[in-house]
Amino acid sequence: MTWRTWYKEHLFTPEQAVQQIKSGQRVVVAHACGEPSIILDALVAHAAQYENVEIIHMVAMGKAAYCQPQYDKNFHHNAFFLGGSTRAAAAEGRVDFTPVYFSEIPNLLREDLRPNVTLLQCSPPDAHGYVSLGVSVDYTKPAAEASDLVIAQVNQNMPRTL
């Protein structure tokens, strides 16, 4: 099977992709410009099918709708850093805050907070079938390597990095 055939067989809508996430799982979301907003929107849109999904995120750059009070039974956010979209939920005691040095996050995800699923953005495949995490390699790469499942939002505008 060529990589092109494999790739076509693994293309899903965001709604189909989030169906792979199960209640009680730990989900790591890529950081900053790597945050897959379309996948997160689909996850929140299907919140009723989830219970106690832990979402680990650095600084949520998007709306972080999963931190809204109506989703408290569906999602539990564990933040390494707090930002504008998560700070109020943390102040209300609805978000866990795990203080950690940025440099320690890869080992934390490999050893102590091993994810079931990683949500990220990537570039389209190159001529050899390789994708790039672009501007979000930081803890995203070790999270993806440690995960049982990676759900990627392919972004035509994600630059290729080595």
Residue positions per predicted region:
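Conserved alpha/beta enzyme-core scaffold
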Residues: M1-L162
